[in-house]
Amino acid sequence: MKIVILASGTGTLLQSVIDNVDTTKIDILAVGSDRQCEALDRAERAGIPTFRVDYIPRATDRDQWNRDLADALAGYAPDLVVSAGFMRIIGAHVVERFAGKIINTHPALLPAFPGAHAVADAMAYGVRVTGTTVHIVDSGVDTGPILDQRPVTVRSDDTVETLHERIKETERALLVDVLHRIAELGISIEGRKARIGSHD
């Protein structure tokens, strides 16, 4: 399975994929970002090609940015696009060109606590259990069909930072596991239900 990974930050999730995927089954074609970041440095150190489509903050140009991102991804012809700490909303041009072929990780048990502040929102709500989700990317924000989830218990002495770090540890293991299963079994999607393989 050929994949392209999108990342925006320090790249710890990306590094977990680089370090742990079976390269005989999963080929990381490239790592892309919307900015210069440590994630790109990690990819370059691993000998993985990188590309940038710098984000355009003006609302009038976001449509063009999404077109440019879609074109950049299409140049690699990936079987799967993996959003791993990519801090931009993936727009319609990308979603339509890679329908059902983009996955994202999220630090909560969706559909609870979507958006950029999921960990803080979960703590503020007082939940006892949160977790991490891998889902198909659709045109909404963290609304796509769910592929897999893993729980993380909220401790009484947790801060947002300590909870987020434990979620990240779980997220790294989950993403690597999901990628291996997709490489072996593929993805099937029927409406809101996404499955790895024909049965899950």
Regions found by a protein language model. Give the residues of each.
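Membrane-interface segments of envelope glycosyltransferases acting on lipid-linked substrates or membrane lipids
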Residues: 1-4, 15, 57, 120-121, ...
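N-terminal Rossmann-like dinucleotide-binding module
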Residues: 1-38
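N-terminal glycine-rich "phosphate-gripper" loop used for MgATP/nucleotide binding
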Residues: 33-34, 62, 76-92
